[in-house]
Amino acid sequence: MSLTPTNEILFHYKSSVKVGELERYVITYHLYDGEEIPPDLNLNSLWLKVRNMNPLSYRAAYLMGPFMLYCDVKTAQYHHSQKIVASVDYPKFEPNVQTQQDFVAELSVHNIRQKYVWIADVMSQILFTTNTNVTYEVTIGTSKESVENPHDLPSHLGSYSPKLTVNRLTTLDLWNLPVQITTPQKKKHLVVLTHGLHSNVSTDLVYIMEQIYKAQKNYPHEQIVVKGYRGNVCQTEKGVKYLGTRLAEYIIQDLYDESIRKISFVGHSLGGLIQAFAIAYIYEVYPWFFKKVNPINFITLASPLLGIVTDNPAYIKVLLSFGVIGKTGQDLGLENDVEVGKPLLYLLSGLPLIEILRRFKRRTVYANAINDGIVPLYTASLLFLDYNDILEQLQKLKENSKKSPLINDASTPVNQDFFNKTFISPLTKMLSILAPQKFPTENGSEIPKVSFFESASSILLPPLPERAYIMDPDSRDPVIIHDKIYNEDDIPQSEFDIEDGFFGKKNILLQAFFAGKKERAKYRNLEETIARRWHEGMAWRKVVVALKPDAHNNIIVRRKFANAYGWPVIDHLIDVHFNGDDDDDNDENDDINSTQVVEPIQSVTEGKKKYRKAENIPQEYGWLNKVETNGVFDEGPTGMISTVGEIVEALAKRGFSAVIDRRNASEDPNDEVLRFEEMNSDLVQ
């Protein structure tokens, strides 16, 4: 007996996600019950559909969104290190489900077993505002036709079949794992993840979070706790100090308790500087903290630790100093602090940060050698590298590549043209000041280096990995091309040594750094000075990687499959930093710290625990906690979008937020959305 259209639908649900939100659906299908296999067993596939329900006209509302979804589905057994034998088990994913578009995937039932389990993720791709959301619906049916054209759906949402169970996990569920009742006595190792510019921790760093948790098996004597601060989302143009202070207060006031005995930091892009400021702030403002907690790992991935001045044209420095991307742009442009008279990144590279960094067990920087249009190699690696060896490894990789070249080889989603016209074109008018330039070379080098425009496009439309790359680990080329520990003695003593010696001025990887006239040379010397300060009295492990585009987001696997080229980088990070070699229950330093006499550090106010700040810190470190007056341009153009959006949201039933909720208007609400964009067109001119 055939199923009717109604009972062909096994599950139907509606939900929505805001910036930094994801929802996971764990789909369990019981093929049969009992020990005996039924004679009439059906092995027909199930079908999954995720539909973006926002109106079609919202595609133009890029500054209030963009209203897009990332979706993927895989079997529960899938792991990227294992070869996929059956092609039907190949993960399905779509990096950019636009409004009124569908993501449809087959859930293959091809073997006789009692239970099948799949995991589907739905992630928001909103970048700029906290007050808009993407509405979507999830449908599971017994045929492709039933999910593509559903009708006569039951009025209630949920599962309509006893064979199908779907568990929905929200962002909070995924980031707050259930407390293990068997480990209350264990010491905790807190791992803090920090996102970069126009990013968020809860979706963009969720892959790293889950991989770190998988390393828990290496730590029988302690419990790993991975957290990230969500309060800086859509605030990232307000400056390193503003963002770092908020992160530090979050660590102290919300995360710390007496069970936390170790701490590690992992920061991507701007997040590397933010976490560095937070560490310095905690060290001085809450001096008791690092007497109670042992610092273990300080890790950055593609972070502009020296700023981004010399790899850009001269006019970029002017734009940064004017605050085109807010206070953050001024920080990255090495603009002098008005009160102190020195750039924040210069101040940050000295005391007190260096003093506490020396106590970390490991300090590691990961840097992209190629295909990163946001953060150049020299600033992500703290400048001093064996560039000749890196160039040699790149040439070997090119010659020995099993597949196509390292650039322009990956498939690109078919809606690239529409996306470029409606999103990238206006966006780059505002953000193009972060565009490392391509300098001509005498020998016509073919070292690939994507532009900022390509990187901006790849945030939401990344060049997709090849099918073989995802299915077969043996098909993947090595990406770690340089992995070395640099001690202070390895650093050249003068600029002369840099230009003519080990670090080769003529190396094409450094041509952008050394190009330019006297004005550029001034900032080059400043960046070199900052780099030397980072190396004083300690060693750094520097890992240089060669990733395909978009390397800046691939290095953190921003989306599990769309940015899969970064899998080996995160594998390396876990293997090196979370391998269990620092797990022990008899750490002498830990025992000393746990019994060390510390001044009273907490008071109770209205039932909430608060930790006291130091009453006085040395005058030379006053820049850490000096209250600043924020100007309107400290937020930059896209930072202001969020602020304006919050104001609009507060005006009841007025403006854009009222339009998207209005159902019975006399006019088509889509027209009002378009008019809203037209009225605010000055934001994108």
From Swiss-Prot:
Highest rank taxon of the organism: Eukaryota
Gene Ontology terms for molecular function: monoacylglycerol lipase activity
Gene Ontology CC entries for this record: cytoplasm; nucleus
Catalytic residues, chain numbering: S269 (charge relay system)
Keyword list, A-Z: Hydrolase, Lipid degradation, Lipid metabolism
EC number: 3.1.-.-
PROSITE patterns: LIPASE_SER
GO BP terms: lipid catabolic process; lipid metabolic process
A Pfam family that the UniProt record links to this protein: DUF676
Family note: Belongs to the putative lipase ROG1 family.
PANTHER family, per database record: LIPASE ROG1-RELATED (PTHR12482:SF62), LIPASE ROG1-RELATED-RELATED (PTHR12482)
Name by which UniProt lists this protein: Putative lipase ROG1
